[in-house]
Amino acid sequence: MTEVTPMVFVVDDDEHVRSALARLIRLSGYSVQTFESAETFIERFDPNGGPACLLLDLQLPGLSGLALQHQLHEWLPIIFMSGHGNMSSAVDAMKGGATDFLPKPVTDSVLLDAIERALERARRLFGWRSELQDIQSRVKQLTPREREVMTLVVAGYLNKQVASELGAAEKTIKIHRARVMEKMKAGSLAELVRLAEKAESATATDTTASYR
């Protein structure tokens, strides 16, 4: 499997700052994309892309850095930078899940350390989301009856109890159960339970995600 190159997004309304940051980030071996506003970033951001972090200016024309953070929710790690930051803004940013809040000007070493921490978190998030997407694709292969069987099986029902609940022959339930195990790529009941729980978690995440 080809490793996905992490991306560093930079949102800052100062063109000189964007250029300087992009140059530093590229020279340090990272991929980088820059944006002059939060609105431009939202238009182009793909939440289903590879692992990435966001280097975000607090004070922006139009949508502010904190407002953008609120819209992105848990989609990617955010490093705030500000020359006008105050304690209240820093607290709000960290409560919102920011990985760092850096005052401008920031030294190269401090910034790059913050980027690496954020990207490490991004890699974990990407791996987690990739796993959930794989599990969801398995669930989609199940027929409606197989999903019913899986729901009851992971709830602890025996085959004869599932048969009684669904009004089917126990032999038929055994066939459905075997197909569920095969399609979900589960080697044991315990693994099927784990997969079902993650599939449910993925559905809940999709339902509550704040990014649009």
Label every model-predicted segment.
Residues 181-212:
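Basic, Lys/Arg-enriched C-terminal extension of HTH/homeodomain DNA-binding domains
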Residues 86-89, 102-115, 161, 165:
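C-terminal output helix
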Residues 36-37, 61-70, 85:
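Acidic catalytic/metal-coordinating carboxylates
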Residues 158-191:
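Recognition helix of helix-turn-helix DNA-binding domains
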Residues 57, 82:
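Active-site residues of response regulator receiver
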Residues 2, 34-53:
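Acidic, metal-coordinating helix/loop segments flanking the phosphotransfer/catalytic sites
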Residues 4-17, 21-25, 38, 54, ...:
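Conserved acidic segment of CheY-like receiver
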